[in-house]
């Protein structure tokens, strides 16, 4: 039901020190979101993208993509959640976001996008230290403290190639 995929985390973390910036602090741009209404396979999709990361110059420091998928329980029509369900899940995502990011000045992750489509919500972060995120999300799953069925995966993507489509969206 909840599979965990963490690809070569230990190897890459030891080879590449993503938390290091040669003693310099990295300025994280203030989040700016654009909302896109789209469709896929005949079903509506709502995509929320943090466009401030488009020109972010330190992408390699956040070289891990964390994708979290939460399944909605209460559905309206066309695979979209009811307003109450949407609010409930998005409030939960906000709590996850705070913990996954950690420090607000030098966060462990940056919020890239959220996609609501076909009965689920996918949230994407770019992460510095995947071990911290894996331990946090793994504990939620192992302790069954999640309000809705969820799954996640963390993959190495130093150049953000797998999520490049989100950096091309214009406000």
Protein language model regions, located:
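Sec-dependent signal peptide recognition
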Residues: 2-8
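Hydrophobic h-region of N-terminal signal peptides that target proteins for export
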Residues: 10-17
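Charge-rich, low-complexity segments
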Residues: 20-98, 105-110, 131, 165
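Short beta-strand
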Residues: 111-117
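The conserved glycine-aromatic submotif of the RRM
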Residues: 117-123
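Helix N-cap motif at beta-to-alpha junctions
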Residues: 126-134
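Short amphipathic alpha-helices in soluble, non-transmembrane regions
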Residues: 136-144
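Conserved short beta-strand edge segments in small beta-sheet-based binding/regulatory domains
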Residues: 143-169
């Amino acid at each position: 039901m909840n599979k965990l995929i963490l690809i070569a985390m230990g190897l890459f973390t030891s080879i590449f020190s993503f938390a290091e910036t040669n003693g310099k602090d990295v300025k994280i741009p203030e989040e700016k979101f654009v909302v896109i209404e789209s469709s896929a396979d005949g079903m509506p999709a709502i995509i929320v993208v943090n466009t401030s990361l488009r020109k972010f110059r330190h992408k390699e420091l956040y070289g891990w993509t964390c994708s979290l998928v939460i399944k909605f329980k209460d559905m309206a029509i066309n695979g979209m959640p009811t307003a109450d369900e949407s609010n409930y899940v998005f409030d939960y995502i906000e709590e996850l976001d705070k913990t996954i990011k950690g420090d607000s000045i030098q966060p462990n992750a940056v919020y890239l996008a959220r996609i609501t489509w076909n009965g689920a919500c996918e949230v994407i972060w770019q992460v510095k230290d995947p071990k911290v995120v894996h331990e946090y999300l793994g504990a939620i799953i192992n302790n069954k403290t999640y309000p809705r069925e969820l799954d996640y995966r963390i993959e190495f993507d130093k150049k953000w190639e797998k999520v490049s489509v989100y950096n091309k969206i214009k406000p």
